[in-house]
Amino acid sequence: MTSVFEAGPRDVSLGSRMLVERSGERMGTLGDADLDDIVAEYAVAAFERHATETAYVTEGGLTVRSTPGATAVYIEVVESKPVFFIVGGGHIGRSLSKLANFLDFHVVVLDDREDFANVERMPEADEVICDDYEAAIDRYPIDANTYIVMVTRGHKQDEVSLRRALGRGAGYIGMIGSKRRTSTVIQHMTEEGFDPAELARVHTPIGIDIGAETPEEIALSIMAEVIMLRRGGTAKSMYHRATSPRS
């Protein structure tokens, strides 16, 4: 949703609104065809950042820096909760479910064992699925707002799940495992003819290196990577070492 709150030099009404879909389709107008085109193009890109922003439009184009005399447009990204699809209900999957719920994701947990896929074990999950990995992933609606992590009990189950998730347009796919093991899986699938570009999008080994050892710490490293990619972060420390001025 976009709306004008400072008209600037353009003959537009304050509060005029235009709805822009992720596809670029529009409903309504801000009152100026040129302004509509500029803002719509920027609004589509805002979906990728999942961010609400203010844009300033001048004769020279659009900027996010406050500019006196510009037409100011508020761009609000309205979308459903991102789906965090956890494949594997073990210790790491359980920790991920708790953390993803806390971070306001729609949490889905899949495991093929009843003892691991139940609401008593996963009370924070919005959906708990006990089914064959291949069948369940095939059925589940996956799109750019879906974040998938493979943390099953073994590399065989991870690879099976990865095969079904590839090429579905997920916003993120990650697979746990050592560098050696995951490299073997990727190489095997490459030799079988899977799209190299799709395989290159798989984050494996998964997570950010924070020295994680416990299931909770590993879950934190995985979620940190997801948030970094979702928000366009760098994972660099924001710590700044203060230095005393030289005497």
Would you name each region that the model predicts?
Residues 1-112, 120, 129, 140-147, ...:
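Segments forming oxygen-rich coordination pockets for charged ligands
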Residues 92, 157, 181:
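Hydrophobic/small residue at the entry helix of a nucleotide-binding pocket
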Residues 114-116, 180:
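Helix N-cap at the beta1-alpha1 junction of Rossmann-like dinucleotide-binding domains, i.e.
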Residues 118-124, 186-191:
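Active-site-proximal loop->helix
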Residues 126-132:
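Conserved SAM-binding strand-loop segment of SAM-dependent methyltransferases
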Residues 157-170:
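Rossmann-fold NAD(P) dinucleotide-binding segment
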Residues 170-171, 176-247:
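Adenosine-phosphate binding glycine-rich loop
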